[in-house]
Amino acid sequence: MSRVGKRPVAIASGVTANVEGQTVKVKGPKGTRSFTVHDDVSVELKDNVIRVAPRFETKRAQSLYGTARAQIANLVEGVTKGFEKKLEITGVGYRAALQGKNLQLSLGYSHDVVYPVPEGITITVPKPTEITVAGIDSQRVGQVAAEIRGYRPPEPYKGKGVKYANEFIFRKEGKKK
């Protein structure tokens, strides 16, 4: 049995949840999201609490219902608080700027990298060396942050590149004479 799946998902005030068959729809102050649960998992809404349980005692159902509960919890958190990832840019001349709906990154290449901001994602640049990616879908926020980081991942010698704000870069010692 999944320890994550056993816990119920509480619906916060100001959020409405609706379960229709295998689809869970959540509407909150930041937007609307929906998630379709696998057929091996049953979903039940009672008293502003969503409970998830496996329909069968198979290994697949056991493994899927904890995941389904986590996804539903992310739906509720996304429409209430939203998700945010912060990126830092380190390096001489490395910087970021927003130009319309594009993020322009100067990362030491011969040309600037232009990243189009996807729908449902908000990117802000408080400083030229900081990028904040926000949205209501945790998977998309993480994916966009990973794509931006992928243009110039931090290198282990000087630490130059794009890294997550809480990421630690293991430094290597340079060549010895």
Curated annotation (Swiss-Prot):
Q: Which domain of life is it from?
A: Bacteria
Q: Which Pfam families match?
A: Ribosomal_L6
Kindly state which keywords UniProt assigns to this record, in alphabetical order.
Ribonucleoprotein, Ribosomal protein, RNA-binding, rRNA-binding
Q: Which terms in the Gene Ontology molecular function aspect does this entry carry? A: rRNA binding; structural constituent of ribosome
- Tell me a GO cellular component: cytosolic large ribosomal subunit
Tell me which Gene Ontology terms the entry assigns under biological process. cytoplasmic translation
Q: What does this protein do?
A: This protein binds to the 23S rRNA, and is important in its secondary structure. It is located near the subunit interface in the base of the L7/L12 stalk, and near the tRNA binding site of the peptidyltransferase center.
What family does this belong to? Belongs to the universal ribosomal protein uL6 family.
Q: How does it assemble?
A: Part of the 50S ribosomal subunit.
Q: What is this protein called?
A: Large ribosomal subunit protein uL6
Q: Which organism is it from?
A: Afipia carboxidovorans (strain ATCC 49405 / DSM 1227 / KCTC 32145 / OM5)
